[in-house]
A protein has these predicted regions:
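Conserved hydrophobic/aromatic pocket- or pore-lining residues that grip, position, or stack substrates
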Residues: 29, 37, 53, 76, ...
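Hydrophobic positions on the alpha1 helix immediately C-terminal to the Walker A/P-loop
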Residues: 48, 52
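Phosphate-binding/switch region of NTP-binding enzymes
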Residues: 36, 42, 47, 77, ...
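Conserved beta-strand segments of alpha/beta enzyme cores
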Residues: 99-102, 200, 309
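C-terminal regions of RecA-like/P-loop NTPase motor modules
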Residues: 2-10, 41, 124-127, 165-166, ...
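Gly/Ala-rich phosphate-binding loop of Rossmann-like dinucleotide-binding domains
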Residues: 57
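Conserved inter-motif catalytic segment of the P-loop NTP-binding fold
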Residues: 3, 10-13, 19-20, 24-26, ...
Protein backbone atom coordinates (compact mmCIF):
# COMPACT_ATOMS: atom_id res chain seq x y z
CA UNK A 1 0.00 0.00 0.00
CA UNK A 2 1.29 3.44 -0.87
CA UNK A 3 2.21 5.66 2.07
CA UNK A 4 0.61 9.05 2.69
CA UNK A 5 1.49 11.49 -0.05
CA UNK A 6 2.29 8.77 -2.56
CA UNK A 7 0.22 6.97 -5.17
CA UNK A 8 2.49 4.37 -6.68
CA UNK A 9 5.44 6.26 -8.14
CA UNK A 10 3.74 9.64 -7.70
CA UNK A 11 4.17 12.26 -4.97
CA UNK A 12 1.38 14.71 -4.26
CA UNK A 13 2.23 18.40 -4.57
CA UNK A 14 0.16 18.94 -1.42
CA UNK A 15 2.94 17.17 0.50
CA UNK A 16 5.72 19.34 -0.94
CA UNK A 17 6.84 22.26 1.22
CA UNK A 18 7.17 25.38 -0.92
CA UNK A 19 10.40 27.38 -0.55
CA UNK A 20 11.50 30.77 -1.84
CA UNK A 21 14.19 31.09 -4.49
CA UNK A 22 17.46 32.21 -2.90
CA UNK A 23 19.59 34.71 -4.76
CA UNK A 24 23.28 35.37 -4.98
CA UNK A 25 22.41 38.55 -6.86
CA UNK A 26 18.75 39.36 -7.42
CA UNK A 27 17.32 39.01 -10.06
CA UNK A 28 20.31 37.85 -12.11
CA UNK A 29 22.03 34.90 -10.40
CA UNK A 30 20.12 32.41 -8.23
CA UNK A 31 21.61 29.94 -5.76
CA UNK A 32 21.07 26.32 -6.78
CA UNK A 33 20.48 27.23 -10.43
CA UNK A 34 22.37 27.72 -13.70
CA UNK A 35 22.94 31.17 -15.18
CA UNK A 36 24.29 31.73 -18.69
CA UNK A 37 26.40 34.84 -19.34
CA UNK A 38 26.97 35.30 -23.06
CA UNK A 39 28.41 37.84 -25.45
CA UNK A 40 30.83 38.36 -28.30
CA UNK A 41 34.56 37.75 -27.65
CA UNK A 42 36.24 40.81 -26.16
CA UNK A 43 33.07 42.38 -24.81
CA UNK A 44 34.13 42.03 -21.16
CA UNK A 45 32.26 38.96 -19.92
CA UNK A 46 35.22 37.55 -17.99
CA UNK A 47 36.24 40.98 -16.70
CA UNK A 48 32.75 41.60 -15.38
CA UNK A 49 32.64 38.21 -13.69
CA UNK A 50 36.08 38.64 -12.10
CA UNK A 51 34.96 41.91 -10.55
CA UNK A 52 31.84 40.25 -9.19
CA UNK A 53 33.96 37.37 -7.83
CA UNK A 54 36.21 39.90 -6.11
CA UNK A 55 33.29 41.47 -4.24
CA UNK A 56 31.89 38.09 -3.22
CA UNK A 57 35.26 36.79 -2.04
CA UNK A 58 35.87 39.72 0.32
CA UNK A 59 32.29 40.27 1.45
CA UNK A 60 32.08 43.56 -0.42
CA UNK A 61 29.18 45.06 -2.33
CA UNK A 62 27.18 44.02 -5.36
CA UNK A 63 27.00 46.42 -8.33
CA UNK A 64 23.67 47.79 -7.06
CA UNK A 65 25.29 48.71 -3.75
CA UNK A 66 23.81 45.92 -1.66
CA UNK A 67 26.24 44.43 0.87
CA UNK A 68 27.34 40.84 0.23
CA UNK A 69 27.67 40.18 3.97
CA UNK A 70 29.85 37.17 4.71
CA UNK A 71 32.72 36.54 2.32
CA UNK A 72 31.85 33.80 -0.16
CA UNK A 73 33.93 31.05 -1.71
CA UNK A 74 34.17 30.81 -5.49
CA UNK A 75 35.52 28.27 -7.97
CA UNK A 76 36.65 30.11 -11.12
CA UNK A 77 37.61 27.64 -13.83
CA UNK A 78 39.07 29.43 -16.86
CA UNK A 79 40.95 27.85 -19.74
CA UNK A 80 41.59 30.88 -21.94
CA UNK A 81 44.25 32.65 -19.84
CA UNK A 82 47.37 31.75 -17.88
CA UNK A 83 46.79 31.24 -14.16
CA UNK A 84 49.94 32.90 -12.82
CA UNK A 85 50.51 35.67 -15.38
CA UNK A 86 46.93 36.69 -16.17
CA UNK A 87 44.15 35.34 -13.94
CA UNK A 88 45.85 35.80 -10.55
CA UNK A 89 47.05 39.37 -11.33
CA UNK A 90 43.61 40.31 -12.64
CA UNK A 91 41.89 38.96 -9.53
CA UNK A 92 44.30 40.87 -7.32
CA UNK A 93 43.74 44.05 -9.33
CA UNK A 94 40.00 43.61 -8.80
CA UNK A 95 40.64 43.39 -5.05
CA UNK A 96 39.70 39.73 -4.66
CA UNK A 97 40.54 37.79 -1.51
CA UNK A 98 42.28 34.97 -3.35
CA UNK A 99 42.08 32.75 -0.25
CA UNK A 100 38.41 32.34 -1.17
CA UNK A 101 38.89 31.75 -4.90
CA UNK A 102 40.03 28.35 -6.18
CA UNK A 103 40.42 26.39 -9.42
CA UNK A 104 41.22 22.89 -10.60
CA UNK A 105 44.80 22.85 -11.89
CA UNK A 106 44.45 21.59 -15.45
CA UNK A 107 48.18 20.99 -15.76
CA UNK A 108 47.74 18.26 -13.16
CA UNK A 109 44.14 17.26 -13.90
CA UNK A 110 43.94 17.41 -17.68
CA UNK A 111 40.98 16.69 -19.90
CA UNK A 112 38.45 18.45 -17.66
CA UNK A 113 34.92 18.41 -19.08
CA UNK A 114 31.71 20.16 -18.15
CA UNK A 115 30.15 17.14 -16.44
CA UNK A 116 33.45 15.87 -15.03
CA UNK A 117 33.21 14.07 -11.70
CA UNK A 118 36.28 16.04 -10.56
CA UNK A 119 34.26 19.25 -10.73
CA UNK A 120 31.62 17.71 -8.48
CA UNK A 121 34.31 16.56 -6.04
CA UNK A 122 35.84 20.05 -5.98
CA UNK A 123 32.43 21.52 -5.13
CA UNK A 124 31.97 19.03 -2.28
CA UNK A 125 35.41 19.76 -0.81
CA UNK A 126 35.49 23.57 -1.21
CA UNK A 127 31.78 24.33 -0.66
CA UNK A 128 31.69 27.38 -2.95
CA UNK A 129 28.72 29.70 -3.21
CA UNK A 130 29.53 30.32 -6.87
CA UNK A 131 31.07 28.18 -9.61
CA UNK A 132 32.09 29.88 -12.87
CA UNK A 133 33.04 27.95 -16.02
CA UNK A 134 34.79 30.20 -18.55
CA UNK A 135 34.12 29.54 -21.37
CA UNK A 136 31.65 26.68 -21.60
CA UNK A 137 32.96 25.75 -25.06
CA UNK A 138 36.38 24.80 -23.63
CA UNK A 139 34.94 22.14 -21.32
CA UNK A 140 33.11 19.91 -23.75
CA UNK A 141 34.03 16.32 -24.45
CA UNK A 142 33.81 17.07 -28.17
CA UNK A 143 32.85 20.00 -30.37
CA UNK A 144 29.48 18.41 -31.05
CA UNK A 145 28.39 18.11 -27.41
CA UNK A 146 26.48 21.39 -27.41
CA UNK A 147 25.10 20.86 -30.91
CA UNK A 148 23.42 17.52 -30.19
CA UNK A 149 20.20 18.19 -28.31
CA UNK A 150 20.19 15.00 -26.23
CA UNK A 151 23.82 15.36 -25.18
CA UNK A 152 23.46 19.04 -24.32
CA UNK A 153 20.35 18.32 -22.28
CA UNK A 154 22.12 15.64 -20.22
CA UNK A 155 25.10 17.92 -19.60
CA UNK A 156 22.88 20.70 -18.33
CA UNK A 157 20.73 18.39 -16.23
CA UNK A 158 23.82 17.08 -14.48
CA UNK A 159 25.15 20.59 -13.79
CA UNK A 160 21.74 21.73 -12.60
CA UNK A 161 21.57 18.81 -10.18
CA UNK A 162 24.99 19.71 -8.74
CA UNK A 163 23.94 23.34 -8.28
CA UNK A 164 20.81 22.26 -6.43
CA UNK A 165 22.29 19.48 -4.30
CA UNK A 166 25.42 21.41 -3.29
CA UNK A 167 23.64 24.73 -2.85
CA UNK A 168 25.72 26.89 -5.18
CA UNK A 169 25.11 29.12 -8.16
CA UNK A 170 26.70 27.98 -11.43
CA UNK A 171 27.51 30.57 -14.09
CA UNK A 172 28.47 29.39 -17.57
CA UNK A 173 30.21 31.97 -19.74
CA UNK A 174 29.69 31.46 -23.45
CA UNK A 175 30.41 33.08 -26.79
CA UNK A 176 27.66 34.03 -29.22
CA UNK A 177 27.33 32.56 -32.69
CA UNK A 178 27.55 34.80 -35.76
CA UNK A 179 23.86 34.82 -36.68
CA UNK A 180 23.37 38.58 -36.60
CA UNK A 181 19.79 39.77 -36.45
CA UNK A 182 18.44 36.67 -34.72
CA UNK A 183 16.86 36.75 -31.27
CA UNK A 184 19.41 36.77 -28.43
CA UNK A 185 18.26 33.43 -27.03
CA UNK A 186 19.08 31.80 -30.36
CA UNK A 187 22.57 33.31 -30.65
CA UNK A 188 24.04 31.02 -28.00
CA UNK A 189 26.55 28.56 -29.37
CA UNK A 190 25.08 25.08 -29.54
CA UNK A 191 21.69 23.54 -28.89
CA UNK A 192 18.79 25.63 -27.58
CA UNK A 193 18.73 23.10 -24.70
CA UNK A 194 21.61 25.02 -23.10
CA UNK A 195 19.50 28.17 -22.93
CA UNK A 196 16.43 26.17 -21.92
CA UNK A 197 18.23 24.69 -18.90
CA UNK A 198 19.55 28.05 -17.68
CA UNK A 199 17.15 29.84 -15.34
CA UNK A 200 18.70 33.20 -16.18
CA UNK A 201 20.42 34.34 -19.37
CA UNK A 202 22.48 37.53 -19.40
CA UNK A 203 23.79 39.04 -22.62
CA UNK A 204 26.67 41.53 -22.76
CA UNK A 205 26.59 44.09 -25.56
CA UNK A 206 28.55 47.23 -26.39
CA UNK A 207 26.69 50.50 -26.00
CA UNK A 208 26.20 51.73 -29.60
CA UNK A 209 26.70 55.31 -28.38
CA UNK A 210 29.83 54.71 -26.30
CA UNK A 211 32.35 51.98 -27.17
CA UNK A 212 33.76 52.01 -23.62
CA UNK A 213 30.42 51.10 -22.05
CA UNK A 214 28.90 47.62 -21.88
CA UNK A 215 25.22 46.90 -21.31
CA UNK A 216 24.19 43.61 -19.70
CA UNK A 217 20.59 42.71 -20.48
CA UNK A 218 18.68 39.84 -18.94
CA UNK A 219 17.04 38.18 -21.93
CA UNK A 220 15.60 35.28 -19.93
CA UNK A 221 14.48 34.91 -16.32
CA UNK A 222 12.41 31.92 -15.25
CA UNK A 223 12.46 32.80 -11.54
CA UNK A 224 11.64 36.50 -11.17
CA UNK A 225 10.62 39.52 -13.23
CA UNK A 226 13.36 40.70 -15.56
CA UNK A 227 13.97 44.17 -14.22
CA UNK A 228 16.68 46.69 -14.96
CA UNK A 229 20.00 46.31 -16.70
CA UNK A 230 23.64 46.36 -15.68
CA UNK A 231 26.18 48.77 -17.11
CA UNK A 232 29.93 48.88 -16.74
CA UNK A 233 32.80 50.59 -18.50
CA UNK A 234 36.30 49.49 -19.44
CA UNK A 235 38.80 52.25 -20.22
CA UNK A 236 42.58 52.54 -20.39
CA UNK A 237 42.53 55.33 -17.80
CA UNK A 238 40.19 53.89 -15.17
CA UNK A 239 40.06 50.19 -16.00
CA UNK A 240 36.82 48.45 -15.01
CA UNK A 241 34.05 50.44 -13.34
CA UNK A 242 30.48 49.50 -12.46
CA UNK A 243 28.10 52.21 -13.60
CA UNK A 244 24.80 53.12 -12.00
CA UNK A 245 22.21 50.39 -12.20
CA UNK A 246 18.65 50.44 -10.92
CA UNK A 247 17.56 46.97 -9.88
CA UNK A 248 14.46 45.90 -8.00
CA UNK A 249 15.01 44.45 -4.53
CA UNK A 250 14.43 40.78 -3.79
CA UNK A 251 11.08 40.67 -1.95
CA UNK A 252 12.27 37.67 0.09
CA UNK A 253 15.70 39.12 0.91
CA UNK A 254 16.99 39.07 4.45
CA UNK A 255 17.88 42.39 6.07
CA UNK A 256 21.50 43.44 5.73
CA UNK A 257 23.96 42.48 8.47
CA UNK A 258 22.99 44.36 11.66
CA UNK A 259 25.28 46.26 14.01
CA UNK A 260 26.57 44.23 16.96
CA UNK A 261 27.28 45.32 20.51
CA UNK A 262 29.86 42.59 21.16
CA UNK A 263 32.06 40.01 19.43
CA UNK A 264 29.95 37.23 20.97
CA UNK A 265 26.76 38.67 19.50
CA UNK A 266 28.38 38.91 16.08
CA UNK A 267 29.77 35.36 16.38
CA UNK A 268 26.32 33.99 17.25
CA UNK A 269 24.78 35.70 14.23
CA UNK A 270 27.49 34.46 11.86
CA UNK A 271 27.54 30.87 13.15
CA UNK A 272 23.76 30.53 12.85
CA UNK A 273 23.87 32.03 9.37
CA UNK A 274 26.64 29.67 8.22
CA UNK A 275 24.99 26.55 9.64
CA UNK A 276 21.58 27.47 8.27
CA UNK A 277 23.00 26.33 4.92
CA UNK A 278 23.94 22.90 6.31
CA UNK A 279 26.59 21.23 8.43
CA UNK A 280 30.08 22.70 8.02
CA UNK A 281 33.62 21.64 8.84
CA UNK A 282 34.85 23.24 12.05
CA UNK A 283 38.08 24.27 10.34
CA UNK A 284 36.13 26.22 7.74
CA UNK A 285 34.01 27.91 10.41
CA UNK A 286 37.10 29.02 12.33
CA UNK A 287 38.52 30.44 9.11
CA UNK A 288 35.29 32.32 8.33
CA UNK A 289 35.19 33.67 11.89
CA UNK A 290 38.80 34.83 11.62
CA UNK A 291 37.96 36.68 8.39
CA UNK A 292 35.28 38.55 10.35
CA UNK A 293 37.59 39.39 13.27
CA UNK A 294 36.26 36.66 15.58
CA UNK A 295 38.83 34.64 17.56
CA UNK A 296 38.76 30.85 17.82
CA UNK A 297 38.09 31.10 21.56
CA UNK A 298 35.07 33.37 21.06
CA UNK A 299 33.75 31.02 18.37
CA UNK A 300 34.08 28.00 20.69
CA UNK A 301 32.38 29.77 23.60
CA UNK A 302 29.55 30.90 21.34
CA UNK A 303 29.17 27.36 20.02
CA UNK A 304 28.58 26.11 23.57
CA UNK A 305 26.08 28.87 24.32
CA UNK A 306 24.09 28.07 21.17
CA UNK A 307 24.11 24.33 21.85
CA UNK A 308 25.79 23.55 18.54
CA UNK A 309 26.79 19.90 18.36
CA UNK A 310 29.94 18.60 16.69
CA UNK A 311 30.66 15.21 15.18
CA UNK A 312 33.51 13.47 13.39
CA UNK A 313 33.18 12.24 9.81
CA UNK A 314 35.91 11.03 7.47
CA UNK A 315 38.61 12.23 9.92
CA UNK A 316 37.20 15.76 10.04
CA UNK A 317 35.11 17.58 12.64
CA UNK A 318 31.80 19.17 11.67
CA UNK A 319 29.38 21.53 13.42
CA UNK A 320 25.63 21.12 13.13
CA UNK A 321 22.49 22.85 14.40
CA UNK A 322 20.46 19.73 13.63
CA UNK A 323 19.56 17.43 16.56
CA UNK A 324 21.40 14.14 16.74
CA UNK A 325 19.50 11.34 15.04
Amino acid sequence: MASKGETGILTLYSDVQATAVRWLWYPFIAVGKITLLQGDPGDGKSTMMMNLIAELSKGGKLPDGKAVGLSQRVIYQCSEDGVSDTIKPRLEKCGADCRNVAFINEETYSGLTLDDERIRQAIIEFRPRLVVIDPIQAYLGSDSDLQIAGRARKLMQRLGMWASVYDCAIVLIGHLNKKEGTKGLYRSLGSIDVVAAARSVLQVERDPENADVRIVRQIKNSLAPSDGEIRFSITAENGFQWLECEIAQDPAAEPETPNFESKSEKAAYLIKKLLSEGDMRSREIYMRMSDEGISRRTAENTKKELGIRSYRKMRQWYWSIQPEE
